[in-house]
Amino acid sequence: MANRPLDILNNALDTPVIVRLKGAREFRGELKGYDIHMNLVLDNAEELREGEVVSKFSSVVIRGDNVVYVSP
C-alpha cells in the first residue's frame, strides 16, 4: 500500500499526471522520473493556465520546491 509521497510517485510512473505549481501553473504529462526532492520529469507535457493549453513540451523537468501537488 502506498502511504508515503514517494510511494505514490513510484506507482504513478509511466502514467499521466497533473502537477500543480506555485503561481497557479499546471503541467499535464506522463511521469517518467522523480528524485527525493520531488523534482519531476514529464514526457509529452502540456503547460496549462486556467485549464487552457499554453505550451507543449516533448520533455520537461519540474523543480520539486515549486510543486504544490501531483495528481495521478
UniProtKB/Swiss-Prot annotation:
**Domain Sm positions:** 4-72
**Which GO-annotated molecular functions does the record name?**
RNA binding
Q: Which PROSITE patterns match?
A: SM (PS52002)
Q: Is this entry keyworded Ion transport?
A: no
Q: Which keywords does this chain's UniProt record carry? A: Ribonucleoprotein
Q: Could you tell me which InterPro entries the record lists for this protein?
A: Lsm7/SmG-like (IPR044641), LSM_dom_sf (IPR010920), Sm (IPR047575), Sm_dom_euk/arc (IPR001163), snRNP_Sm-like_arc (IPR022901)
Q: Per its UniProt record, what Pfam families does this chain match?
A: LSM (PF01423)
Q: Which GO terms describe its cellular component?
A: ribonucleoprotein complex
Q: Which domain of life is it from?
A: Archaea
Q: Show which residues constitute the signal peptide.
A: none
> What's this protein's family per the entry?
Belongs to the snRNP Sm proteins family.
Q: What is this protein called?
A: Putative snRNP Sm-like protein
**What is the species listed in this Swiss-Prot or TrEMBL entry?**
Methanosarcina mazei (strain ATCC BAA-159 / DSM 3647 / Goe1 / Go1 / JCM 11833 / OCM 88)
